[in-house]
């Protein structure tokens, strides 16, 4: 048997505990029979972050959680998890080391004497296969969402935002697949409870997979708020942009196309084209403010130049001004104040390169370099907006005020360089040690000022 159980009546507790460093898959408890599967794990993390910037600082994280998952009668799947953690040291460094803290309510609220955070996820998923090569599934739960491709970040929904409460429908038959989600989340954090609000995101994606050639998909998303559930957006068999027009054009709609190839062995290409709002008029006038478009393309090459266990990834992303923004700030393409799409935001581009090398099944080296450029809005000394160049997802275009035409990267240009080197070790099964060094530099080309951040993170992860 290749599994170990901490709570196992067949052995003493200490005999079970001795399996901690074994090569077996470990559980607190598991149950398997022809009707029910249940697997329960405990997971904990100890993290130390050390900054080497102008002001040296450090931070420590400690968290512990439980995860349970399984199936009932082969059709109903379930998962449940939660974790709670505390922080000692620099809060600003903590949010740099773990960006998830920027949208964690307990961390942002910051009213307790010890900074802390918590996370919880869970879902129920019912799945059937009524015919060969056919799958139908309905899922209700809370988890992260990722829609679309992207080796660095997806242009559509990156999966790096907060967990959302989701109703999901999936259908697959042969080469055709379709997914539809309706999710709820929240807006920016506000100290005043009455100013907090919920918002909703609906998205559909249809994909055709041609074996050994490519997968091609088309999809759409809608962000809306200020009211309860909009029944039109719960219907998966509807073109949301046209439905949004019939609902008096209050919401933020996007459309996207994406492609992933498989016709070259060990070499994969991904590409995405993203259209925000205006999808028909003036597409030939690329500098018009309403042409809120973005595109991304890249490749993954496994064992390039016949170098075993090596992977090489390159990707370019370009996002025009005002993408992800909306005339109603509550309908921006954000959750808890964090951009749901690509991290660089509007009026920006990025070149990304990743190299991964497996020394063995228990040791992996990861190297990453990113160079991005962004054009930021110009503000007066008193904080008022002087020139809007579409560089802020929360600052929409102002009719009769802002320029109707603008160049890409207009405004105050920043060049950002990011370098990361990480080593992951698994000395024993499900016990991981991660060592990561990060260096980043943000240069304001108008003033020549630089903001440099460098830090080392040591992370111990244990699951039993």
Model-derived segments and spans:
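Outer-membrane beta-barrel channel domains
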Residues: 1-215, 221-226, 287, 291, ...
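Exposed, low-structure sequence patches enriched in small/polar residues
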Residues: 117, 214-222, 227-464
